[in-house]
């Protein structure tokens, strides 16, 4: 089944809900980049969060970038997500794997904090109208959910809960997705309702298991986690949206990027290497540019003064 996003409200319109399934997206990213289990999960969580953030943008061409800049062994992580349901991303050390951590109950989990280290989450929102909006917050845990919730609270002044999760088995990614819960201004004026919503969010346990159990039926997931808050998908065409991994890179874009190198560098590549090879960071597609194509680029540049 295709990955999808569902927009909904609950508590009589007092809270905004966005649920997403990203299993296929994460599987494709894992295959494209040769990701380990740890980096598959970290990039998957970031792509999930990026899609949930982009879902609130007013224009369909709007995009959200999430960048994790830290001193941890993952080095860096970058995600580009669109309001149109597309997403792409990469990590600095795709093969990174760390020993899992074990809690008092004997359960194992990924060591996100060690992988991320200390650093910042940088968020950029671009609606294509003037300068993009940029914001930076300190990393809370490196597990993405708490980090994005911190961004929403401190940069957008929107009380939010962000749940991201996955189930991993020996074959790879069994399930991946997330849930965004935001208290709307209407509910923020009612302390009792705010307290109830916060309590319900604290009571959400085993999110990854519940996500996997719901499969692609995200409406069932909403009913499962908020049974007494009457979650309802929006009553319009925006209620459900298909999601996919997509990168707009191309052979022509690769050649356009080479123009930035200038005449001397292009000439050197033509003469010494007989062409050029470019690899897209976001999707790992490779593009080969021949010596003849390099010559065409050189011929199109303004003559040297």
Curated annotation (Swiss-Prot):
InterPro entries: Heat_shock_Hsp33 (IPR000397), Heat_shock_Hsp33_C (IPR016154), Heat_shock_Hsp33_N (IPR016153). Transmembrane segments: none annotated. One of its GO terms (cellular component) is cytoplasm. One of its GO terms (molecular function) is protein folding chaperone. It comes from the Bacteria. The keyword Membrane does not apply. It is found in: Cytoplasm. Belongs to the HSP33 family. This is 33 kDa chaperonin.
């Amino acid at each position: 089944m295709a990955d999808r996003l569902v927009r909904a409200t609950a508590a009589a319109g007092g809270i905004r809900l966005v649920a997403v399934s990203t299993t296929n997206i994460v599987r494709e990213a894992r295959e494209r980049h040769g990701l380990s289990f740890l980096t598959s999960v970290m990039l998957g969580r970031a792509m999930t969060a990026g899609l949930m953030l982009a879902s609130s943008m007013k224009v369909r061409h709007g995009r959200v970038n999430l960048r994790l800049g830290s001193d941890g062994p993952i080095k860096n992580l970058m995600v580009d997500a669109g309001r149109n349901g597309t997403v792409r991303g990469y990590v600095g050390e795709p093969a990174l794997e760390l020993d899992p951590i074990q809690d008092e109950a004997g359960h194992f989990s990924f060591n996100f904090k060690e992988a991320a280290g200390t650093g910042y989450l940088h968020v950029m929102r671009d609606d294509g109208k003037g300068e993009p909006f940029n914001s930076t917050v300190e990393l809370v845990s490196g597990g993405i959910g708490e980090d994005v919730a911190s961004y929403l609270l401190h940069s957008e002044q929107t009380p939010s809960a962000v749940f991201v999760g996955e189930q991993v088995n020996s074959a790879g990614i069994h399930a991946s997705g997330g849930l965004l819960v935001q208290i709307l201004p209407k509910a923020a004026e009612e302390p009792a309702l705010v307290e109830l919503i916060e309590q319900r969010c604290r009571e959400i346990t085993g999110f990854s298991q519940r996500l996997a159990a719901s499969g692609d039926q995200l409406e069932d997931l909403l009913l499962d986690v908020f049974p007494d808050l009457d979650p309802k998908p929006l009553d319009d065409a925006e209620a459900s949206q298909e999601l996919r991994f997509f990168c707009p890179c191309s052979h022509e874009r690769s050649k356009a990027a080479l123009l930035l190198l200038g005449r001397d560098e292009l000439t050197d590549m033509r003469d010494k290497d007989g062409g050029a090879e470019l690899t897209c960071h976001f999707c790992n597609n490779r593009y080969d540019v021949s010596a003849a194509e390099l010559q065409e680029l050189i011929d199109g540049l303004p003559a040297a003064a």
